[in-house]
């Protein structure tokens, strides 16, 4: 069996980098937003897909998540949530809202 060495950052290093990226996003840095999206989009898409069971809708929810991140980044407080936790919560709420609409139920206002 062949083993492949994968170099990864520790969770703490990644979290610090995520906070730095989000600070840059708050300053209007589109590249930072792209890097943050590239880093987390697969996990967020899987989360949304787990709720919606539809790949296209899951992708739409992830795109909506990063649109919200673009406008709300300056309000994020890393003392309350890790960045990925916030991204996951925005994605989860968006997917649940979409699921409610699909089922003909009213949206829940946040």
Task: Please tell me what each predicted stretch does.
Residues 53-54, 75-79, 104:
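Short connector loops in the HATPase_c
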Residues 1-27, 31, 35-38, 67, ...:
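Intrinsic, short, N-terminal disordered tails of RNA polymerase sigma-factor systems
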Residues 46, 55-58, 82-85, 99-101:
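Short, intrinsically disordered/low-complexity patches at protein termini
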């Amino acid at each position: 069996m062949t083993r492949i060495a994968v170099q990864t950052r520790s969770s703490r290093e990644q979290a610090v980098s995520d906070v730095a990226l989000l600070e840059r996003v708050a300053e209007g840095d589109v590249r930072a937003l792209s890097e943050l999206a590239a880093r987390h989009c697969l996990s967020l898409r899987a989360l949304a897909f787990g709720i919606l069971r539809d790949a296209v809708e899951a992708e739409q929810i992830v795109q909506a998540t990063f649109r919200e991140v673009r406008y709300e980044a300056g309000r994020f407080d890393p003392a309350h949530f890790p960045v990925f936790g916030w991204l996951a919560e925005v994605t989860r709420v968006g997917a649940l809202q979409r699921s409610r609409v699909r089922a003909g139920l009213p949206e829940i206002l946040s």
